[in-house]
Amino acid sequence: LVREMKEELEEKLGTELLYAAAAIPPGTDALDGGAIKNVVQGAGFEITALLDEPTAANQILKIQNGAVVDIGGGTTGISILENGKVINVDDEATGGTHFSLVLAGAYKLPFSEAEIYKRDKKNHKEILPVLKPVIEKVASIISRQIEGYNVQGLYLVGGTCCLSGIEDIIGKKTGIPTYKPEN
C-alpha cells in the first residue's frame, strides 16, 4: 500500500522520491520503531529520521519554548522544548478514540458513527459539553507531564485538536495559554 502511494505521488510529481522520515508515538521506539522503519524501507525509501510525533510536529511549528501536545487517535504525546531543544517527551493513553467512545455512549451510536459525528464541525458546539470531562483528563495529563518545567505555552497538534473549543478548556484547566493551528 505504501509503495503504491509512493509510486502514485512520484508519477504526479514527475520525480523519484528517495528519502523519508517517519514519526511514532513517544516512548514506543522499541515497539514501533522497527516496524515503521521496515514499512518505510519496504516502500523504497531510505529513512532519514525516526522521530516521536510531537517532536516531528515541532519541525514545522518551530516552537522555541513551551510544550507541543499531540492529541492523537489513542494517545496524548507531549514534547517539552527549551531554546528549541526537546528536553522531555512523554505519551499517555487518552486521545480521540476515547472522545468517540464517550459520544457513542452518550448518543447511543455505533463507534464508527460517533467518530464521523465528532469530526463534523457543525456538531462541535453541541458535543463540547459532553466531551468536557475527557478534555479535562487530557489537560490533567498535560499538567502532570509538564510539572517541574517552565512551560509558558501549549501548542496543540493532532487530529483531536480540530475539535472547536478544546484549546479553551485545556487552557483554563492548566492555567497556561493554549494555541492550536487553524483547521
What are these regions (language model features)?
Residues T76-I80:
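Short beta-strand scaffold segments in enzyme catalytic cores
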Residues L1-I71, N83-E92, G96-N183:
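Nucleotide/phosphate-binding catalytic cleft detector across ATP-hydrolyzing
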